[in-house]
Amino acid sequence: ALALRLGADAAVNTTKEDFRKEAMDLTNGRGYDYVFETAGAAPTMYMAFELAANKAHVCFIGTPHVDLTFTPKLWECMNRKEFWLTGSWMSYSAPFPGREWELTAHYFATGQLKYDPELIAEKLPMSRAQEAFMKYKVPGSVKGRILLVNEWAFPDIV
């Protein structure tokens, strides 16, 4: 639903049992020319390989925290598709804040960056940062992101 509100032509719920069929039906069984994996979770990384079309571009943005292993079947899938696999540097630039942060702020300020308030689950003052991080200890307990706000600079936001 969020992807559709932000302008996607179609969206597939990967928690549904038949999501692979639904996803492939959208491309008439061809697969996707561009696949961006942003979670960094092994299941979604494998899913990216499965959903990619022949000669596709697969980009990993998420950072995995477990080893990835490939079954012979998955390896064969990757080999036969001959896709391009690249990684993308996230938002760790130096000197801070870096060009990507400046561009993001510009596009947000000018309305060129589409944004949905549901992306932010909760706003907390910076003084409660430890509490915010603790909420993420239980997988799935936070839907969206927690925005930490510098309360002395933006007292009206928190």
Which residues does each PLM region occupy?
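Short, charged/polar "capping" segments at the starts of alpha-helices
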Residues: 1, 68-70, 155-157
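Adenosine-nucleotide cofactor-binding segment
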Residues: 1-47
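Short, structured coil segments at secondary-structure junctions
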Residues: 6-7, 54, 81
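Short beta->alpha linker loops
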Residues: 14-18, 39-40, 96, 121-128
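C-terminal substrate-binding/catalytic core of Rossmann-like NAD(P)-dependent dehydrogenases/reductases
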Residues: 20-24, 68-120, 131
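Short glycine-/small-residue-rich Rossmann-like dinucleotide-binding loops
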Residues: 39-40, 62-63, 89
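C-terminal hydrophobic helical "lid"/dimerization subdomain
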Residues: 46-50, 54, 99-158
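ADP-ribose/adenylate-binding Rossmann-like module
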Residues: 52-70, 84-85
